[in-house]
Amino acid sequence: MSMIAHVINPGISGVKLACAVIEPGQNPAFPSHLQVSLTREELPLEAAPDELGLDALAERILEQTAAWPAPDAVVGRGGLMGRVPAGTYHVTPELARYVLENVSGSQPADDPNPGIGAPLALRVAQARGVPAYIVDPQSVDELLPEAHMTGVPGVRREARFHALNARAVARRAAYEVGKQFREARVVVAHLGVTTSVTAFDQGRAIDTTGTAPDGGPMGARQSGPLPTRAVIRLLQTQSESELLRLLTRGSGFFALTGTADLSEIERRQEQGEDSVVQTAIAAFVHQVCKAIGEQTAALPGRPDAVALTGGIARWDAVVDRIERRLAWVAPFIVLPGELELEALAEGAGRVLLGLEGVREWTPEGVTLRPAAPLVQVETVEEV
């Protein structure tokens, strides 16, 4: 039995789309490891999604996907819904309205449109007569209570990290080392424009460095850890919004080398004569290794795998340095780029195939509907 999901992932310059054919896996020992075949397309945008309007954007998606096989569900990238457990969520008009109205003003450079995935998925799903889902939204929070605490009463560490991609990579890494995701310990380092390093224990992200502007090693544009007094001095010369932009978009390799183009930085590194690039790479590797060590220590035992993902994981020279330094920790699994389209499709597939229950969200809390094969849903009101 196969299922079809239409996948919607809004980005900086366009909307990534995919038609996913989802089938049960071939290994009965790993029933949740699905086989997913994606047909990918991109809908380029000449203006920001909020300027185009959600109705117009949904119409363009419907036009571009009109020739695709009819879906069993539409799945989009999630938004900020308060602190919620990981999983696949049924998109209702109430949820779609909430994520549109609760968009943080300090989104990192690689997460510009966190509020539109759910309402877009709902509009397209309503037109197709199928349910809409989101998977592992940005505000997933399953951290240990002590991981939230700081030494200052009232100041709390938040759980903002690359939840969708990191969980998908952790699942894949567990499978690669022969472990069920809900039995494995995995450390995932997402290395890209922004970064985060996260410890997964038995299917839960129990601790994380966070990502810009709250934490994580330096990235292509992310600052990495800063001394507190330096941040205080910076606030004396610029506004909060200016400082947030500096920490999330104007720092890291971009500030140190003059470019965030990783292929250009790699070219300069290979020439071996650019001391600025060599020093920046050394600092990056040092910070990533420290962060992996920190998250390893958050686990109740040795990890089964360390996984590297994100755009910088394509950079062999950097990956080799990290692996050599930390080879003693656990086997390394390298999954370059991002698996967001696959993660969205797989999350919908686990629900459609009855392998996992679907979560229902309201402002008052989250409930889990028991796992069951897909059933027809009733028509819901417009957002």
UniProtKB/Swiss-Prot annotation:
Annotated Gene Ontology cellular component terms: cytoplasm
GO MF term set: acetate kinase activity; ATP binding; butyrate kinase activity
Main location (coarse class): cytoplasm
Keyword 4Fe-4S appears in the UniProt entry: no
EC number(s) per entry: 2.7.2.7
Keyword flag Magnesium: no
InterPro entries membership: Aliphatic_acid_kin_short-chain, Aliphatic_acid_kinase_CS, ATPase_NBD, Butyrate_kin
Subcellular localization(s) per the UniProt record: Cytoplasm
Keywords: ATP-binding, Cytoplasm, Kinase, Nucleotide-binding, Transferase
EC category: transferase
Catalyses which reaction(s): butanoate + ATP = butanoyl phosphate + ADP
Superkingdom of the organism of origin: Bacteria
Family: Belongs to the acetokinase family.
Listed name of the protein: Probable butyrate kinase
